[in-house]
Every structure is written in structure tokens, then in C-alpha cells.
């Protein structure tokens, strides 16, 4: 069994040598499945439940992959800026949707989607709206299709400077931002901007 929230993920594993509870430092239901797979493989080679739990609890994730950070004005940022494809965006959206307060998706284009690129971007815009994301700020030519499908509450930006200005004006203690986009979009520039500002908290 497991319980998800933005701060951590609590799990209870039932293994051949007994049950054990643990707290994961990584976000998302998909990471619960990753932990289950790691636990199964570890059990198969004879690692104790205590060592499995300890190892899983120590893993803090990978930079740019669903990392929770604080930014100015008390807002929360989920840094998933390292890369993006439709499935990873959906996984990140499910994490954002589970948060309280206003939910803002900051989306850069997804690359390497071939002839289906427009369709995939449209789907992400529609899915974000349907699962309860409040606002969408988008950067890149393809993400304009996400904005169109999202509808009211979505804005498309031609440059990162205008996007950052708009995001800064939206920050408040009840706001959670998800920053997501393919590597070539360099969405980590936005993360760095807000991390720098976070020192003023």
C-alpha cells in the first residue's frame, strides 16, 4: 500500500521476510512502481527488508526529475525540466494535480515526436485542463497547440523573458509550479531563475 503527497511518498511493502514501512523522497505514482521493481529485484538476490527500505529511503531522485523546490513568495516549484515526452508529462501532471492550491504548468515543446507532434501537444493541453490544472504558461512553437486546447487560463510566450515576468507575477504561497519541457528548450533556465530568487525567502 502507499500514500502520495507533495512532501513524500509513504509505502508499506510486504516481502517474504515480513512487512516494512518506508518513506520515499521521490514524487509520483510511477516512482512507487519503480520502488516496487527495485524491491522485488533486491529480494530475489537475498537483500534484507531493512536494507531494501534503507536504500529506497536514501534515494533522492535525479536533478531535473520531479524535484520539489521552494521559490520566491512562498510558492512551490516541481522541477521536471530535464526532458519531456508525452508519458513523462502525464506522470508529472498527475503529481501537480495532487497538490493543493493553484496549479500552474510551465510547458516547453516536446521534441522528437515526428508526424504526431501537433496531436501530442494538443492532447497534453486538453489533459492538463481535464485533471484540474489552473493555468498553463507555454514556450515554443508546438506548445502553442497545447495552449489552444487548454483554453481559458493558458498563455503562449514567444520568449523566455516574457514568460518569466508572467510567472513571477503569479507566485504566491498557495501556488505550485511544474516546469517541464524537452532538453532543447532549456527549461532549466526558468528553474535557475527561481532558485536564485529563493535565496531571498
Role assignments for model-derived ranges:
Residues 12-14:
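A generic structural motif
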Residues 3-10:
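A short, compositionally biased
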Residues 7, 17, 21-30, 36-201:
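ATP-dependent carboxylate-amine ligase
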